Amino acid sequence: MNLTYLRSFYTTVKCNSISKAAKQLHLTQPGVSMQIQKLENDINFKLLNRSNTGVSLTSAGEIIFEFAESMLSIEDNLQKN
């Protein structure tokens, strides 16, 4: 599982928006969208429901979001040390 894609997914959920996540990550909106799609393809599950009002997690997305939170926290701690 690609941590860059996982970070894009995590940030999108936290921002409730792909475009807001893209700004925060200094990426383009299509780039973030593509990373999330690749993550979904890698694990064979849809993670997000996309709408004009934002994004919401699917049941698989809820599980992966918790996993992402743990993995990204570990990665951040490793980079600090």
Annotated model-derived regions:
Residues S17-I18, I36, R50:
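Helix-turn-helix DNA-binding elements, focusing on the entry/boundary residues of the two helices
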Residues D42-I43, I64-N81:
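Alpha-helical linker/hinge and terminal dimerization helices associated
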Residues E40-L57:
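A short LG(V/I)-centered, amphipathic sequence patch enriched
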Residues Y10-H26:
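Short helix-boundary/capping micro-motifs
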